[in-house]
């Protein structure tokens, strides 16, 4: 049996995890730690540049209030979250996140994130609260900021170290233990404060992907519920972590639908029932007041599609071809401009996947599917336990 070396690391702040939340915590904490002479240590079970839920990239930022230009107020955003989650929300926490998010986005842009802008230099919105980005390297940019901040403060980063248990002193978490996935080393991290940012939990429920596709999921398959385990073990409050998130995505490869619904204004239909948002509109009356707000809560939109599926009217489709043609129609009297716009929209459709879900682009290519010519199947994913998209906090 291999002889394992025990490595003891002493620090003031221990950050467990290496995704977006951990990198953000490291960047902010290091700023203050440097002034106070404190040490920050970050431990990632993967490699910081491409770890976490944003490892493959993103094609949009899904929360931007627009305070600088007076687009919305914090109260507007609170009302939106309350409506979308049908009243199940911790509004104090939502408010606290919302008041900081714009300045964070501006930092991302300063660090090198490409945010779409129009001819007037204004951000291009996907929807009221979303910004379009070229985000294939999103995580790399944020990881670089965290690395620089930790280095400047004299802290440490440990990669390929799998944290398995918190260290408890009574009811206080004072560190964590874990092992290297590359070397025969067992780590004992001793800290005065610990941040658990290790993602949510996937594969708790049976995945839709089976056979050769087994293991493919919308949420990263590497997220094994470590944050929940740490929280429970340490006796900390679990706010909204019980929320099960069921996103609708393009079937099989889990490509994003946000740009299609919000930017391209696409419709979703069922094979045998048509536009279920129109046909089943009366069902929304049963969910007042939330069924009557605009935009209609995401879970109710999904529910109406699932009703069609349960009645044997499925599968569901995203009308990509119709959406692209509708946008290009404004140039129908100018064949040259029409052709140019069609190519531009086709490029944006593919880029949406290449920025954040490359597997969906590969699937389209493998099927020789052209979004401007044929619609694509969409489906609800299996449920996930996930921090950020619980939305309620």
What positions do the PLM features span?
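Glycine-rich FAD pyrophosphate-binding loop
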Residues: 32-56
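Mobile, glycine/GP-rich and aromatic-enriched active-site lid/loop segments adjacent to catalytic centers
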Residues: 102, 109-164, 169, 241-393
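Glycine-rich loop(s) and the adjacent beta-strand/alpha-helix scaffold that form part
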Residues: 196-256
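Core beta-strand elements of the Rossmann-like FAD/NAD(P) dinucleotide-binding domain
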Residues: 8-11, 182-193
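Short, well-ordered coil/turn residues at beta-beta hairpins
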Residues: 17, 191-193, 197-198
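N-terminal Rossmann-like FAD-binding beta1-loop-alpha1 element of flavoenzymes
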Residues: 13-41
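Glycine-rich active-site loop/strand segments that organize a redox cofactor
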Residues: 61-97
């Amino acid at each position: 049996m291999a002889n394992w070396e025990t490595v003891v690391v002493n620090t003031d702040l221990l950050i467990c995890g290496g995704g977006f939340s951990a990198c953000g915590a490291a960047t902010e904490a290091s700023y203050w730690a440097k002034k106070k002479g404190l040490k920050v240590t970050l431990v990632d079970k993967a490699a910081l540049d491409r770890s976490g839920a944003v490892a493959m990239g993103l094609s949009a930022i899904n929360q931007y209030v627009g305070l600088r230009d007076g687009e919305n107020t914090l109260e507007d955003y609170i009302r939106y979250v309350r409506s979308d989650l049908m009243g199940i929300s911790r509004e104090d926490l939502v408010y606290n996140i919302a008041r900081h998010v714009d300045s964070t986005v501006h930092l991302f842009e300063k660090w090198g994130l490409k945010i779409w802008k129009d001819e007037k230099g204004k951000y291009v919105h996907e929807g009221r609260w979303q910004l379009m980005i070229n985000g294939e390297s999103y995580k790399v940019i944020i990881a670089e900021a965290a690395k620089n901040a930790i280095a400047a403060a004299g802290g440490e980063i440990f990669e390929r170290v799998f944290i398995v248990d918190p260290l408890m002193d009574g009811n206080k978490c004072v560190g964590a233990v874990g092992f290297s996935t590359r070397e025969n080393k067992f780590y004992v991290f001793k800290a005065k404060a610990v941040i658990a940012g290790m993602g949510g939990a996937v594969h708790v429920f049976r995945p839709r992907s089976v056979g050769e596709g087994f293991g493919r999921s919308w949420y990263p398959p590497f997220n094994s519920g470590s944050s929940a385990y740490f929280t429970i073990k340490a006796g900390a409050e679990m706010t909204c972590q019980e929320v099960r998130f069921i996103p609708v995505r393009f079937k099989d490869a889990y490509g994003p639908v946000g740009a299609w619904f919000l930017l391209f204004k696409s419709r979703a239909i069922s094979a045998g029932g048509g536009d279920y948002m129109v046909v089943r509109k009366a069902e929304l009356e049963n969910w007042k007041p939330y069924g009557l707000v605009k935009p209609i809560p995401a879970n109710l939109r999904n529910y109406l599609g699932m009703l069609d599926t349960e009645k044997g009217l499925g599968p569901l489709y995203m009308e990509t071809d119709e959406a692209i043609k509708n946008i290009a129609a404004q140039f129908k009297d100018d064949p040259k401009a029409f052709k140019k716009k069609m190519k531009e929209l086709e490029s944006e459709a593919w880029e949406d996947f290449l920025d954040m879900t490359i597997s969906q682009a590969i699937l389209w290519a493998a099927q020789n599917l052209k979004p401007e010519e044929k619609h694509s199947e969409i489906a609800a994913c299996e449920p996930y336990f996930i921090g950020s998209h619980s939305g309620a906090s």
